[in-house]
Structures are given as C-alpha cells and as structure tokens.
C-alpha cells in the first residue's frame, strides 16, 4: 500500500500554457519537469497516482525520465476541462456530480483569468443538479440551461427552476436546444 502525501506526492505544480508543469515524488525517484496537458489540481494528483502504479508494476527501480515525460505529454482527457475553442474561450467539461463541478470551479478560478464565465449546463435526470449548480455558483456569472437529445436528459424547463433557485432568475436563461444554447453563450 502506498499513500498519497506519504510515500508519493505532487511536490510542485505550476500552470503552463496548455496544462501544467509538475514535479512528482514517486516511490523510487523524483520526476521533474513533467508537462501534463490537462488542467486542474485533481489531474496532477491523478498523474501522480498513475506514475506510482507504473513504478510498482516495474519493480524496485526508477522509471526512465524521458519515457515519463513523453508519456505524460501525450495524455488526453476529452471532456475534462478541455479547451475546445479560443476567442472566445470555450471549455468543455463533463462534470456530472457536485465533486466534479467543484473540481471544475476550482480549476476555472485558479488556472484561468476570465472576465466573465457563462456556463451552458445540461444534466441527466438522475444527477444532483442542485449540488452541481451550488458548486458553480460562486464563479459563474450566467447560466444557460439546456438539454441533450438523450432520453436521460432532464428537461430544460425543470433545470431552469433548479438553476434559478441557486443563481437567481436574473442570471439564468433557458435554451432547450443544445446547439442554440452554445451559440447564445458565445454570442453574449
């Protein structure tokens, strides 16, 4: 058993263009200047856990630093704080519970410098929409509620009521069609 913060940890983390630069203390060595093309403190912790798993798999020797750097530089996580457009910046995140929404909010607050944040939100009916909105409320200026074509999608009218109870009705808009909601967000 290895424990984060005891046998391994993220020693340093700096925001970098397109991700973050890490130094990770593994079980067998310290790995520095690791570029991770993902955003968020939680992604750095995930990277450290992955590194330690690979170290454990290969036994009692340090990993080749060049292989570690190349491996992490090639990492992708589609739909997780993924920058899909610039000017205006559009970030796609598939947070589907309050914990994921908190990680998104922390990342947006600490790693980006936006003057205004407009969130386009659609939620499945079996998810904690109130909890998701409560985590986003401190950092989001306006919310556009929508729904996907999935049969599991919460109707946008229901989501509108929930969002309005958290944000206030003056900060929430309903656009039931997802593509139209995205168009509205980038036009505003």
Name these PLM-found stretches.
Residues 2-4, 63-68, 171-172:
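Short, surface-exposed acidic
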Residues 1-4, 82, 91, 173-175:
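General small-molecule cofactor/ligand-binding pocket signal
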Residues 1-31:
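Extended acidic/charged loop-beta regions that coordinate divalent cations
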């Amino acid at each position: 058993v290895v424990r984060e913060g005891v046998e391994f940890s993220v020693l340093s983390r700096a925001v970098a263009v397109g991700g973050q630069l890490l130094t990770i203390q593994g079980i067998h060595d310290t790995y520095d200047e690791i570029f991770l093309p993902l955003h968020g403190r939680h992604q750095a912790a995930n990277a450290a856990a992955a590194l330690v798993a690979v170290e454990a798999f290969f036994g009692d020797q340090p990993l080749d630093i060049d292989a570690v750097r190349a491996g992490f530089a090639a990492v992708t996580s589609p739909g997780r704080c993924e920058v899909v457009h610039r000017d205006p910046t559009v970030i796609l995140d598939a947070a589907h519970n309050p914990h994921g929404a908190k990680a998104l909010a922390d990342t947006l607050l600490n790693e980006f410098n936006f003057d205004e944040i407009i969130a386009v939100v659609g939620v499945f009916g079996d998810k904690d929409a109130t909890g998701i909105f409560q985590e986003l409320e401190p950092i989001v200026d306006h919310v556009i509620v929508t729904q996907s074509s999935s049969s599991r999608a919460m109707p946008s009218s229901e989501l509108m009521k929930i969002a309005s109870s958290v944000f206030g009705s003056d900060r929430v808009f309903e656009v039931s069609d997802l593509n139209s909601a995205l168009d509205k967000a980038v036009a505003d």
